[in-house]
C-alpha cells in the first residue's frame, strides 16, 4: 500500500507553473505557430485571416504600440494562449478591437481563456476604451458562446478596417 500512496501523493503535488503576463519578443515564434495551428485545427480560412497576416510573426512589435496590449498565458515556460486589444484602423478613438485571442489545445477547458479575457477587459478600462469590437469565424463556436456570455452583442456588419475579410462574425461590447 505504501508505494501506491506515495505515487498518488506524488501526482497530487505536481507543480504547475501558470502565469499571465504581457507579450515578450521571445514569444513571437511560439505565438505565431500556435495561432496558425489553431486556424488549421479548426479548418478555418487562411486567406483573409490572421493566418496570412504578416503581423502575426511580430506580435511583440505590434503590441509595443501605445493603447494596445497582448496578454500571454505561460504554462511551464511555454506560451499556450494569448488575447489582446488593438486600436484597429477605422475604429473610433474610444473603440479597440479584441484581437489574437487563441488557445493551444493544452490550454482549453481550464479557465485560461476566461482569465485572458478578464485581463484584457481590465486593460480596456485602464486604456480608457469605451467599446470593444471583435471579429471571428463561425467555426469558433465555443469562443463565440464565451463572447456572448461576456456581454458581446452580434452586429450585422463589420466596423473598422482589420483587413480580415474572411471573418464574418462581428461583435461589440460596452466596457
Where are the regions a protein language model picked out?
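Residue-level signal for beta-strand positions within conserved beta-sheet cores that form or flank
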Residues: 16-19, 94, 130, 167
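Acetyl-CoA-dependent GNAT
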Residues: 18, 22-106, 117-119, 123, ...
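C-terminal "cap" of GNAT-fold acetyltransferases
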Residues: 130-133, 137-175
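Conserved N-terminal entry element of GNAT/NAT acetyltransferase domains
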Residues: 3-26
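Residue-level signal for short amphipathic helical patches enriched in basic/charged
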Residues: 26, 127, 135
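Positively charged, low-complexity intrinsically disordered regions
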Residues: 1-4, 174
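Conserved glycine-rich acetyl-CoA-binding loop
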Residues: 78, 91-92, 104-118, 127, ...
Amino acid at each position: 500500500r505504501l508505494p501506491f500512496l506515495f505515487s498518488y501523493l506524488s501526482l497530487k503535488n505536481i507543480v504547475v507553473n501558470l502565469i499571465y503576463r504581457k507579450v515578450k519578443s521571445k514569444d513571437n515564434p511560439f505565438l505565431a505557430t500556435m495561432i496558425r495551428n489553431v486556424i488549421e485545427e479548426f479548418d478555418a480560412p487562411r486567406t483573409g485571416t490572421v493566418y496570412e497576416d504578416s503581423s502575426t510573426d511580430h506580435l511583440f512589435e505590434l503590441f509595443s504600440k501605445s493603447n494596445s496590449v497582448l496578454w500571454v498565458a505561460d504554462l511551464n515556460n511555454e506560451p499556450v494562449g494569448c488575447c489582446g486589444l488593438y486600436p484597429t484602423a477605422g475604429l473610433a478613438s474610444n473603440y479597440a478591437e479584441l484581437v489574437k485571442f487563441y488557445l493551444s489545445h493544452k490550454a482549453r477547458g481550464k479557465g485560461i481563456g476566461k482569465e485572458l479575457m478578464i485581463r484584457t477587459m481590465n486593460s480596456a478600462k485602464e486604456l480608457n476604451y469605451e467599446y470593444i469590437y471583435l471579429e471571428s469565424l463561425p467555426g469558433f463556436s465555443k469562443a463565440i458562446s464565451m463572447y456572448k456570455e461576456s456581454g458581446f452583442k452580434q452586429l450585422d456588419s463589420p466596423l473598422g478596417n482589420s483587413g480580415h475579410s474572411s471573418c464574418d462574425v462581428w461583435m461589440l461590447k460596452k466596457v
